[in-house]
Amino acid sequence: MGQALRKLTAADYPVVVQEPRKKVLAVKGLVKAYKSQHRVLDNINFELHAGEFVAIIGRSGAGKSTLLHILNGTIPTSAGEIINYHENGDTQNIAALTTKQMRKWRAKCGMIFQDFCLVPRLDVITNVLLGRLSYTSTLKSFFKLFSEQDQARAIELLQWLNMLPHALQRAENLSGGQMQRVAICRAMMQNPKILLADEPVASLDPKNTTRIMNTLQKISENDIAVIVNLHSVDLVKDYCTRVIGIAHGRIIFDGPPSMLNDSIIQDIYSDESAELLH
């Protein structure tokens, strides 16, 4: 007779322990107000971890784009801190950086836009190479020659997004989807740890929308934190791992897309939420 079967226990199965994702950024008490004293952003608090794919949603004028530009350093804060966590454990308040220090920060915090922001008359590969200049002064940028390493990186990125055949084509002759792929390549030239995307698919057709969202998802899967400003809740649920809902300058929801029900969506997009916040 064969050997009696032994009852399997938990000890027979390998235990897979997932390491907590690295914290890359913490926003604390962020406020943005203009001369009218109107607070576009009011007491914004959240943490960001490597590999997260975070959607920012809300009505037009809720402060979504302003938040992304503040994180990138192109708009100053009125109050609060933006803490950058370095690999060695050191921290740095982005909101207090000098102009020179801010250029170095932008090398680690790439950004793409709805209108692509390419130089129309330059060819594709030169537009991508311009991503290497974000950390240098404007004057030095005009006289800096791109290294062979820079050129190899640009070619690698263009090949990754199937844009290498268009490398010598002027940017103005590309389609919207192609322009956004070039913009992503440019943002990735510095190997950023954070990628900000301000309405990256707002002007694209469904096919190119899917392509760009798939690309952003792949980027996040490579331990890069991605924050995207989106209008489509369906895209948020299909692609993102986390949602931050902003209404009238304040965060009223922060959680996984699975918790984003009709009631919460209505609160985020309804004018009635203003009465609850003020």
UniProtKB/Swiss-Prot annotation:
User: Which Pfam family, giving just one, matches this sequence?
Assistant: ABC_tran
Instruction: Kindly list the positions annotated as binding ATP.
Output: 58-65
Q: What's in the GO CC field?
A: plasma membrane
Q: Which UniProt keywords apply?
A: ATP-binding, Cell inner membrane, Cell membrane, Membrane, Nucleotide-binding, Phosphonate transport, Translocase, Transport
Quote the protein name from its UniProt record: Phosphonates import ATP-binding protein PhnC
InterPro entries, alphabetically?
A: AAA+_ATPase, ABC_transporter-like_ATP-bd, ABC_transporter-like_CS, ABC_transpr_PhnC, MetN_ABC_transporter-like, P-loop_NTPase
Gene name? phnC
Q: What is its EC number?
A: 7.3.2.2
